[in-house]
Amino acid sequence: MAHYFVGDIQGCFEELQLLLNNVDFNPSKDQLWAVGDLVARGPGSLETLRYFRQLEGSGRVVLGNHDLHLLAVNAKIKRANPNDKLGPLLTAPDIGSLIDWLRMQPLYQELPEHNLVMTHAGVPPQWSLETLREEADHVAAALRSDDYLTSLICHMYTNGSNCWHDSMSELERKIYCINALTRMRFLHSDGRLDFDCKLPPSACEDPDLSPWFEHSGLLNSTHTLVFGHWAAVMGKVPSSTIHALDTGCCWGEHLTLWHLESNQKITQNKLKKS
């Protein structure tokens, strides 16, 4: 079995299909892992969700911030970003079943035989694998509940839960988990999440900020970590066991596919017409 990991698709469905054709992806024997943000800026968000849903066991997905935002937009809790191309998805006849499928997806995935963990934005340095499992599973349970919109989604738009500590309420822990696993980029020197700076690490001039993956972490010392989210990084991280797969396809750059077994990365430039 070949394991392929793809960066943020964001509705760039044609580029995804070109990549998969390039490597002769066969869902009967291969697996496709996606780092989240399946939807948003590209024109093929509907096709992307339908594709991963029909992959069933041959596809492994984690939720990204744009995927969670879609849940809020579909429920009219938030308005769609005018730069997103979600119209065909939001008006599709199967939008209800697609939303239900999406909210059943987790915030992390594991490949134990390779000591590999995948999330959308990364893993907080102070979290062990056990903490990641426990906190992310609590969020997943909330998303799968019938009242997920009122109990979780309508509360998640806050920057307040930016520092992990033992005295957090249950809801604060869930919001911190969402913020860390789907929005994290830079951390302050005391470990607080920073939500303002989205620059490439080399362009950040604030001495108190550094990328989360440059902090000494409990997981990145023992596991291979796969993440997306931060297109400005363009795949450049100072570790051979951390793979940054968002290479900005929806921003005019390219989509990246990583083949685990050969440790090769294959790219597809964004198509001009999309």
From Swiss-Prot:
Molecular-function annotations in GO: bis(5'-nucleosyl)-tetraphosphatase (symmetrical) activity
Key words of the record: Hydrolase
Record SUPFAM superfamilies: Metallo-dependent phosphatases
Name of a matching Pfam family: Metallophos
UniProt-listed InterPro entries: ApaH, Calcineurin-like_PHP_ApaH, Metallo-depent_PP-like
Documented EC number(s): 3.6.1.41
Keyword Mitochondrion assigned: no
Reactions mediated catalytically: P(1),P(4)-bis(5'-adenosyl) tetraphosphate + H2O = 2 ADP + 2 H(+)
Key word Hydrolase present: yes
Enzyme class: hydrolase
Function (record text): Hydrolyzes diadenosine 5',5'''-P1,P4-tetraphosphate to yield ADP.
The family this protein is said to belong to: Belongs to the Ap4A hydrolase family.
Name of the protein in its database record: Bis(5'-nucleosyl)-tetraphosphatase, symmetrical
Species for this entry: Shewanella sediminis (strain HAW-EB3)
Gene name as annotated: apaH
